[in-house]
Each structure stands twice: as structure tokens, then as C-alpha cells.
């Protein structure tokens, strides 16, 4: 069968059935292609998308050395570790590690993640309950945050005063797929791919899918002989793009808060920014309506707007 005669999915559905959870369906695909794409996308999302997470925890400057130690709160040491580990975090593009610190003293109170002291470039994207502090004795909890890709098992349980944790860096917390039968005309030997994705909120499901597809595409570029199937490939040429879109977002002269929000979600170029919708930006850590209004005004001065589709945008800039 000639390459140009292969079916491509024309019926694409997106069902955001819960917060940070979306089901995508693609039909119709040639028999076997559904499984090939589904498996590749699943593995890439779970193990090849970069992110940040808590990798170690120190309590009372390393004086708490066992899960059985008594601390001044209703929760056990193990409970504290699990609660802090569950934090969804991001690090700015130019920051590799960060620290989350809780210093508790005084009267009893319930402690949530919003009360943490954060190192520069670090953000917590969702509120999480940490502990019920009983008051009296001081309690200090320090968590180290690192960037990484995929899964990294802890080499030890406890070392140098720190509880070491298995690290799951990918913002995709669940991904699975199912292949169903599809039909086009008289052909019934086709695939329908249903892809179910859940994220921790640091990226939305559509962005996670786009990142995975782009990574696979870039890997295949090194394998495919361009000359042989040139008719079926569109090669993006930066010369065909408005040069303003290739400029860095710093040239918009945004406030520090807005700039840091864009860095946190890895938006570097104006062209990357204009392809985002208002809703996508508002989901970014610490991004509010003031930042949104500022960005819209700056783009308007250049004759640009959010939600713009750039068909020939290069994926490898």
C-alpha cells in the first residue's frame, strides 16, 4: 500500500471528564497502528517527560531518624513524609533544585502547603494538608525538590539525616489506552485509539499529549530517510514565520511575576506564548488575571493575540 493511501485519524474527540483528567479518541487508523501509537505515547508520557518532585525530607535538622520517632503533631513521621511527598511542584527553567520549609512553633494549628517557605524559582501548584500541629515543641520540616525525567528509585531509606524518596518526575500520573474497532465505508478492519490521561496539574492533558507526540516525532526524524518519503513530510522553515514570534518573551518587558510564571511552564518564545489559550495560562502556577491582562495588552501592541494557531511552527527551536 502506498504511503499516501494510509488512513489518518479524522475523527478526534476530547473529553475532559474530571479535573486534570481527559480521554482522547482517534479514528480511524490502520489495523495495528492504534496499538503502536497508544503504546508509544503511553511510555513517553510516563517515562520521558521532564518534571519536578520532592526527593528527600529532613525533620528537625536531621534529628528525627526513624519512622517511629515521636513528633509534636497528630500524624506519624510516615504520614508527614507521604503528605509532603504528594506536593505538586514546579521549578523555573533556570533552576535545578529547590527547598520547601515548614517551621512550626507556638499554638496548635492545622498546617497546609500554602504556609511553606519556598526557595526562589519554586512553586507549589495545589494546596495539600501537611499535619495537625499540637503546639509547644518546635517542628521543622525541610523537603528537597529536584528536576528529572521518568522514575528514579531511592538508593537508601535514610542517609545523612534525610529520608530519601523514590522520585516520580513526570507530571503524568496515569496513562492507559484501549483499542476498539472502527469503520470507514465498507472497511471494518480498522482501529480506534482511546487514550486516558491524568496529570498532577503542572501541565494539562493536551499539553502532555503534545509533548509526548513531539518527542516521538523528533526521535523518528533521525530514522526516516527524508528523500524517500519527501511528499508525505512537511519541513518547517523558520524563514516562513513572522520574526516577532521567534523573539524571547523577555522582549515583551513583562513584570517579574508574569515573566516567572511563563518560565515555570517553559514558555520561552513569543510564538510559544501566542499559541496558548487564556485557560491554559490561568492553569500555570501563580498565574492570575492581572498577568493575563498584562500579556494580552503587550501582545495587542504587536498585533498578536492568544489562542493563535501557527501551522508551520518548528518543534525543535
Swiss-Prot record:
Residues 1-227 are annotated as: Alpha N-terminal domain (alpha-NTD). Keywords: DNA-directed RNA polymerase, Nucleotidyltransferase, Transcription, Transferase. It comes from the Bacteria. It catalyses: RNA(n) + a ribonucleoside 5'-triphosphate = RNA(n+1) + diphosphate. Its EC number is 2.7.7.6. Residues 241-317 are annotated as: Alpha C-terminal domain (alpha-CTD). One of its GO terms (cellular component) is cytoplasm. One of its GO terms (molecular function) is protein dimerization activity. GO terms for biological process: DNA-templated transcription. Belongs to the RNA polymerase alpha chain family. DNA-dependent RNA polymerase catalyzes the transcription of DNA into RNA using the four ribonucleoside triphosphates as substrates. The N-terminal domain is essential for RNAP assembly and basal transcription, whereas the C-terminal domain is involved in interaction with transcriptional regulators and with upstream promoter elements. Homodimer. The RNAP catalytic core consists of 2 alpha, 1 beta, 1 beta' and 1 omega subunit. When a sigma factor is associated with the core the holoenzyme is formed, which can initiate transcription. This is DNA-directed RNA polymerase subunit alpha 2. It comes from Francisella tularensis subsp. holarctica (strain LVS). The lineage of its organism: Bacteria, Pseudomonadati, Pseudomonadota, Gammaproteobacteria, Thiotrichales.
